[in-house]
Amino acid sequence: MVGKNNSNHLPPGFRFHPTDEELIMYYLRNQATSKPCPSSIIPEVDVYKFDPWELPEKTEFGEKEWYFFTPRDRKYPNGVRPNRAAVSGYWKATGTDKGIYSGTKYVGIKKALVFYKGKPPKGIKTDWIMHEYRLSESRTQPTRPNGSMRLDDWVLCRIYKKKNLERAIEMMKVEEDTQEPQIMSVTNPIHEVVASNGQQTLKLPRTCSLSHLLEMDYFGSISQLFDDNNSYNTISQNNTLMTNVNGYVMPHQAMEKFQLGEVSQISMNPSYQFQ
């Protein structure tokens, strides 16, 4: 198992994100042939003697995913079928095995498994996922002090909880989004208002900046706003004076307020209220 000293001597900012090929060529192969690994951060743990939620505390390294070297327990002494039973459930293979290549050479196999609580076949599926890596060769491994083991008796397991990993990815996306400049757009600046008699009139938004006024196509130019020849067409409907501005109708009181009372405020205050 990895000691604290090994973890503490890792360089600042170190992240362990090996590729499938690197896991096979530099870690599992070395472990199976009794050679030292590039870094002693993957402990030897029999993952089938624990439930998956107990495994993170068995290693000093890893936050969202954890790596282990584990002996490949077989269901029958002379058989090849693995025993995947755990303490309170079992690991069930899902999908098809994936071949791992180093260049054009076939070097290993990757298998995906899901943990189920209870006994088969009525176990309850959980969010715990295992990727099991094993070597493709089957030559004899050198004898170890604790006995002889075949090359494929060692597997490398990557274990993680599906929701935790998805949440971490989602948080990374949120952080990226918050760093991008936010642009607010204004749509439909004029709203239809239904009068008491059922007729529709147009209502201006409550707040509007000077730049917004200048950009509104339906207002025309500022000079047109104060041009008596084409701006004032007073009509009387339901005892309400209405003003036609370039074909759009709004209450005469609002237009009068805009023209007479609030013109000076537009240049002083970027936010202007019509009502």
UniProtKB/Swiss-Prot annotation:
Keywords: Abscisic acid signaling pathway, Activator, DNA-binding, Nucleus, Transcription, Transcription regulation. InterPro entries: NAC-dom (IPR003441), NAC_dom_sf (IPR036093). It comes from Solanum lycopersicum. PANTHER family: NAC DOMAIN-CONTAINING PROTEIN 2 (PTHR31719:SF244), NAC TRANSCRIPTION FACTOR 56 (PTHR31719). Transcription factor that binds DNA motifs 5'-CGT[AG](5N)NACG[ACT][AC][AT][ACG][ACT]-3' and 5'-CACG[ACT][AC][AT][AGT][CT]-3' in target genes promoters. Promotes leaf senescence (developmental, light-induced and ABA-induced senescence) and regulates fruit yield and sugar content, probably by establishing abscisic acid (ABA) homeostasis. Activates the expression of senescence and ABA associated genes including NCED1, ABCG40, CYP707A2, SAG113, SGR1 and PAO, by directly binding to their promoters. One of its GO terms (biological process) is abscisic acid homeostasis. Expressed in roots, stem, flowers, and leaves. This is NAC domain-containing protein 2. It is found in: Nucleus. One of its GO terms (molecular function) is sequence-specific DNA binding. The NAC domain includes a DNA binding domain and a dimerization domain. Disruption phenotype: Delayed leaf senescence (including delayed leaf yellowing phenotype under darkness or after ABA treatment) but enhanced fruit yield and sugar content, likely due to prolonged leaf photosynthesis in aging plants; these phenotypes are increased in plants lacking both NAP1 and NAP2. Residues 107-168 bind DNA. Residues 10-162 form the NAC domain. Its main location: nucleus. Induction: Accumulates during age-dependent and dark-induced leaf senescence. Induced by abscisic acid (ABA). GO terms for cellular component: nucleus.
